[in-house]
């Protein structure tokens, strides 16, 4: 069964100190990065949009109350999620921003009041349009011809999908110019999606062919556009609705309404049936209510209404704050709900040993999808809601992910219902399960020897953010485990090509490539290796802090909890988790076996760590020989901060080709802007080789 990844259940009002806030912030960052990865990279989210937004807002609140907790890689400074390398990456001519999600009418009215006051208008005109539940894409036309397609990616860079986009029948390869002249360069954005009926037919065909079906149209659309073989994309029933022109070469229009009129004249489809021009927010709210009533009858999935200030002068006045344009809001729909019964409860064991209770439900249809499972998060949640086996419950499914139990319908009880408690022993390895005092966290103590943990740990260990063994994806990791070839991480380094050639889908070249990649992974930066180990509560930021404080792995292994808590941003709970991990003989044994295999760790923070100390950099555009994450990591290794937005604390903006609004923002603030040559010159002045 798939792992159900829990999310932190935090009471922010109970946090009254910086150490406690630091622990909470690290938990939230780790959870958000994980969910970004599942949403943007795997196309397999395990939390609803509402739950993600709740976590995001909690982290925003903590960082606002404790500014010292803000980190350059915090999800609050990101527009979106990470980009895979397989398709290649491109830099967007202008950032593809995300929209602030709101769920209550009061929030919408507050948004509208802000617009009205800051624009100095009695009535603000909005454009209200459906928020499609698909994959955001960008197309670039030059001289009327399609030259590039890309996914949104992290908002600054995206995956290059030109060949795939060209297979979508509704996408013009050449724009019409009979009704309106076509600009020399046009950058348009839209949402790729599948109609419900076409998605259902597509899934039926896959089922008949013995292939895995997609959970929902959004995942199907995203997976189809990310194919390496465009012939596969061509066979998928994809469509695109366009909604925006990026302001990269100045604006030829005064309002968003004018853009929506121009797009179809060029052959770019917009959702004309459900777009409304609204004079005042009441009209937009009425349109939202109408779409809520009609959403199940629409031929495609939408999950809310996007409300935008119509005129672009208003956009300029309101501007962008962090990751959100202040001139727009996404008013999300309420989650779909249904009543069913709990047939059984069981627990799943995640990568870090976290135990998650899951309810087995009597099958019920929610929003057109049959639901048979619901996450219960933790024992505290079970006790608080008094959930028992046999109960009739109200469930909700928001964002097409694993549903949640909203409440028990106690009037339906007949006395046969049975209470449930997380077991004292791990159901997979038999090790002791430790339950926290507040019952919000339970962990299997089996560590690296627990098969359930190991299955997920191996995937994490090989991931791009960890040791980056590119050829060891999830399916291949599962294959190695199921074949009995590896039981611990160190077994990876005992594999031989002959072992792989016995397995399906391996030829001589692919087997040798994987062996070479595994061998290369023995040379690692200390912080990446610490992150790869999957220590509970240790994300990439905490791993970096540890590498900055301890020169070697041995020094960290020998550190006690008191020594660990002297590090800024590492509280007692995180320190206990680290010390417990390295005190475990099985964990230390695995690390020793990896050393015997040739593990070599380099600590990039041990030398020249302060050469750029005190400086804050912002990178924009494309840099030759650097990915965005690589150059940010490089300056951080030399003591600098790397942030995603320009502020009064920014010392330098490094701008390459395709630099967008960040360069303009720097010019407006009088912040030095460096091209790549000037950036390298600065590094040389500090005695740093790049």
Swiss-Prot record:
Residues 607-690 form the BRCT domain. One of its GO terms (biological process) is DNA repair. The active site is at residue 131. It catalyses: NAD(+) + (deoxyribonucleotide)n-3'-hydroxyl + 5'-phospho-(deoxyribonucleotide)m = (deoxyribonucleotide)n+m + AMP + beta-nicotinamide D-nucleotide. GO terms for molecular function: DNA binding; DNA ligase (NAD+) activity; metal ion binding. Its EC number is 6.5.1.2. Pfam families: BRCT, DNA_ligase_aden, DNA_ligase_OB, DNA_ligase_ZBD, HHH_2, HHH_5, Nlig-Ia. One of its GO terms (cellular component) is cytosol. Zn(2+) binds at residues 426, 429, 444, 450. It comes from the Bacteria. Keywords: DNA damage, DNA repair, DNA replication, Ligase, Magnesium, Manganese, Metal-binding, NAD, Zinc. NAD(+) binds at residues 49-53, 98-99, 129, 152, 191, 308, 332. Its cofactor is Mg(2+); Mn(2+). It is an enzyme of class 6 (ligase). Belongs to the NAD-dependent DNA ligase family. LigA subfamily. DNA ligase that catalyzes the formation of phosphodiester linkages between 5'-phosphoryl and 3'-hydroxyl groups in double-stranded DNA using NAD as a coenzyme and as the energy source for the reaction. It is essential for DNA replication and repair of damaged DNA. PANTHER family: CHROMOSOME TRANSMISSION FIDELITY FACTOR 18, DNA LIGASE. This is DNA ligase. It comes from Salinibacter ruber (strain DSM 13855 / M31).
């Amino acid at each position: 069964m798939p792992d159900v990844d829990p999310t932190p259940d935090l009471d922010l009002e109970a946090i009254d100190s910086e150490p406690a806030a630091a622990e909470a912030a690290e938990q939230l960052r780790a959870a958000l990065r994980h969910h970004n990865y599942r949403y943007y990279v795997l196309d397999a989210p395990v939390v609803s949009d509402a739950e993600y937004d709740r976590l995001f807002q909690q982290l925003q609140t903590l960082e606002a109350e404790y500014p010292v907790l803000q980190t350059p890689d915090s999800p609050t400074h990101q527009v979106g999620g990470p980009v895979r390398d397989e398709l290649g990456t491109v830099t967007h001519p202008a950032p593809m921003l995300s929209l602030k999600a709101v769920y209550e009418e009061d929030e919408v009215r507050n948004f509208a009041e802000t617009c009205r006051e800051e624009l100095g208008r009695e009535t603000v005109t909005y454009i209200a349009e459906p928020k499609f539940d698909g994959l955001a894409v960008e197309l670039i036309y030059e001289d009327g011809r399609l030259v590039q397609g890309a996914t949104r990616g992290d908002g600054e860079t995206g995956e290059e999908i030109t060949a795939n986009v060209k297979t979508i029948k509704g996408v013009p390869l050449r724009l019409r110019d009979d009704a309106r002249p076509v600009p020399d360069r046009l950058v348009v954005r839209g949402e790729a999606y599948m109609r419900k009926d076409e998605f259902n037919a597509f899934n039926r065909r896959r089922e008949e062919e013995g292939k895995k079906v997609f959970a929902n149209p959004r995942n199907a659309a995203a997976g189809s556009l990310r194919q390496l073989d465009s012939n596969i994309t061509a066979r998928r029933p994809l469509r695109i609705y366009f909604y925006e022109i990026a302001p990269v070469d100045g604006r030829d229009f005064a309002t968003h309404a004018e853009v929506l009129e121009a797009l179809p004249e060029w052959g770019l489809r917009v959702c004309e049936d459900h777009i409304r021009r609204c004079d005042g927010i009441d009209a937009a709210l009425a349109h939202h209510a109408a779409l809520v009533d009609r959403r199940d009858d629409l031929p495609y999935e939408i999950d809310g209404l996007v409300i935008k200030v119509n005129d672009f002068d208003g956009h300029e006045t309101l501007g962008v704050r962090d990751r959100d344009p202040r001139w727009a809001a996404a008013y999300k729909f309420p989650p779909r709900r249904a009543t069913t019964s709990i047939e059984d409860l069981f627990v799943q064991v995640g990568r870090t040993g976290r135990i998650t209770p899951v309810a087995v439900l009597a099958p019920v249809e929610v929003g057109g999808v049959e639901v048979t499972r619901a996450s219960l998060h933790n024992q505290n949640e079970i006790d608080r809601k008094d959930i028992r086996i046999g109960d009739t419950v109200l469930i909700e499914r928001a964002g097409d992910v694993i549903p949640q139990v909203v409440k028990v319908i106690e009037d339906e009880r007949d006395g046969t219902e049975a209470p449930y408690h997380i077991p004292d022993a791990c159901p997979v390895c038999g090790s002791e399960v430790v339950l926290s005092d507040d019952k919000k966290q339970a962990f299997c103590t089996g560590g690296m020897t627990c098969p359930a943990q190991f299955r997920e740990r191996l995937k994490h260990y090989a991931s791009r953010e960890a040791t980056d063994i590119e050829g060891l994806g999830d399916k291949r990791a599962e294959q190695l485990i199921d074949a009995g070839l590896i039981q611990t991480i160190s077994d990876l380094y005992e594999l031989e090509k002959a072992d792989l050639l016995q397995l399906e889908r391996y030829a001589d070249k692919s087997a040798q490539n994987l062996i070479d990649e595994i061998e290369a992974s023995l040379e690692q930066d200390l912080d990446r290796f610490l992150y790869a180990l999957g220590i509970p509560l240790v994300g990439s930021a905490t791993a970096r802090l540890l590498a900055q404080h301890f020169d070697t792995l041995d020094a960290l292994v020998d550190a006690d909890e008191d020594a660990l808590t002297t590090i800024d941003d590492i509280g007692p709970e995180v320190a206990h988790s680290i010390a417990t991990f390295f005190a475990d003989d099985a964990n230390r044994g695995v690390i020793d076996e990896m050393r015997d295999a040739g593990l070599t760790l380099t600590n990039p923070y041990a030398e020249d760590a302060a050469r750029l100390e005190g400086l804050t950099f912002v990178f924009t555009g494309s840099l030759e020989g650097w990915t965005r994450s690589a150059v940010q990591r490089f300056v951080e290794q030399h003591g600098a901060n790397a942030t995603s937005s320009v502020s009064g604390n920014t010392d330098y903006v490094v701008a390459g080709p395709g630099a967008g609004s960040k360069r303009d923002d720097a010019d407006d603030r009088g912040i030095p802007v460096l091209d790549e040559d000037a950036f390298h010159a600065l590094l040389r002045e500090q005695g740093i080789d790049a």
